[in-house]
Design a protein with these regions (language model features):
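Eukaryote-specific, cytoplasm-facing alpha-helical/coiled-coil scaffolding segments in long proteins
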Residues: 26-36, 58, 119-128
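Minor-groove-contacting beta-hairpin "wing" of winged helix-turn-helix DNA-binding domains
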Residues: 112-119
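Short amphipathic alpha-helical interaction segments
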Residues: 84-101
Length: 146
């Protein structure tokens, strides 16, 4: 979910280029993940109250926001600079370090800054951001796409 959120923030899939920003701060990504998990959980609960069972009607297209939200919120919030895997900051940082090792982003730990690489830009531009795939990603994140 963290990776999906990162991708949606960097690439909006509209206009002559799909890339919508040059960098993202780690703290901003962490806040966006929390906000999107809360929004997805609220949508999931709303659908359950309306009698729409997400897991039987749309099982393949839906993320389990309840479990993800519980797991993410169970992580501690720590002071700036903490990199323990048991904190939200550390968890998001570990994911960014993984993406950095894969050559998909440049993660500058000192500045807590995330930038995409040409490798990720090309993958997103030519493989992921066709209309069908972008709409599925946005739907999974609880966003509407037109």
């Amino acid at each position: 979910f963290v990776i999906l959120t990162l991708l949606v923030e960097f690439y909006d899939g509209q206009g002559s280029t799909s890339k919508s920003r040059e960098f993202l701060k780690l703290g901003e990504l962490q806040n966006l993940v929390s906000e999107r998990l809360k929004a997805g959980l609220a949508l999931e609960q709303e659908r359950e109250q309306d009698g729409t069972n997400l897991y039987t009607e749309m099982y393949e297209n839906v993320l389990d926001y309840k479990s993800m939200s519980e797991a993410y919120e169970s992580l501690k919030s720590a002071e700036t600079g903490s990199r323990s895997k048991y904190t939200k900051e550390g968890y998001v940082s570990i994911i960014c370090e993984f993406l950095d090792r894969q050559g998909l982003i440049v993660f500058v730990r000192e500045d807590e800054m995330i930038k995409t690489t040409a490798k990720l830009d090309n993958v997103m531009e030519y493989k992921i951001l066709n209309k069908e795939n972008y709409a599925r990603i946005m739907e999974a994140l609880g966003e509407t796409y037109e």
